[in-house]
Amino acid sequence: MVNSCCGSVCSDQGCGLENCCRPSCCQTTCCRTTCCRPSCCVSSCCRPQCCQSVCCQPTCCRPSCCQTTCCRTTCCRPSCCVSSCCRPQCCQSVCCQPTCCRPSCCQTTCCRTTCCRPSCCVSSCCRPQCCQSVCCQPTCCRPSCCISSSCCPSCCESSCCRPCCCLRPVCGRVSCHTTCYRPTCVISTCPRPLCCASSCC
């Protein structure tokens, strides 16, 4: 039984046996729970019932195998972009999904509108599409983030002083902050600006 099953030709009747789990038997008909061994991790055996930690190999990176135990660098594929796989080593551009918005995944390639979360507010993610009120942190004060909808007043740092941050109609009220002025914004009701050009102070 063993020789006839675990040789070059595997029969469907005996391939599920415990003593038959050999690399030569890892064919589609052999993908059973009793055959989930490291030596059986081939693409034809990547079934949900075989997705164990021992089967996390590059050839086994299938959507059905994207489980927490399979989140390894060799399994970072677009089909494996699930929330349980959001590890630093899996943060590739193909994995930038809303479910992958973790601090460890906040890299330049992941700076998309779906990833604009407070936990993702890092300097490398300071893009215009991420300049939301939740992302107005000192590390996010970049020229590209100085837009009127999100930069006044919570994001008006010295590095963010742009004319779009100093709206004239509200310069004397809400957004009158000393770190957010430009010559176009200086009016008599505002204090001496710290971010103004010397010619305007």
UniProtKB/Swiss-Prot annotation:
Q: Looking at the record's lineage, which domain of life comes first? A: Eukaryota
The sequence repeat boundaries are: 5-9, 20-24, 25-29, 30-34, 35-39, 40-44, 45-49, 50-54, 55-59, 60-64, 65-69, 70-74, 75-79, 80-84, 85-89, 90-94, 95-99, 100-104, 105-109, 110-114, 115-119, 120-124, 125-129, 130-134, 135-139, 140-144, 145-149, 155-159, 160-164, 165-169
Do you know which Pfam families this protein is assigned to? Answer: Keratin_B2_2 (PF13885)
Tissue specificity note: Expressed in the hair follicles.
Recorded hits in InterPro entries, A to Z, give: KAP (IPR002494)
Alphabetized, the UniProt keywords read: Keratin, Repeat
Report residue spans for region: 31 X 5 AA repeats of C-C-[GRQVIL]-[SPTR]-[VSTQPC].
Answer: 5-169
User: Coiled-coil segments, which residues?
Assistant: none
Residues that span the membrane, as ranges: none
Q: Name one GO cellular component term.
A: cytosol
- Reported function: In the hair cortex, hair keratin intermediate filaments are embedded in an interfilamentous matrix, consisting of hair keratin-associated proteins (KRTAP), which are essential for the formation of a rigid and resistant hair shaft through their extensive disulfide bond cross-linking with abundant cysteine residues of hair keratins. The matrix proteins include the high-sulfur and high-glycine-tyrosine keratins.
Please describe the quaternary structure of this protein.
Interacts with hair keratins.
The UniProt similarity line reads: Belongs to the KRTAP type 4 family.
Q: What is this protein called?
A: Keratin-associated protein 4-12
- Name its species: Homo sapiens
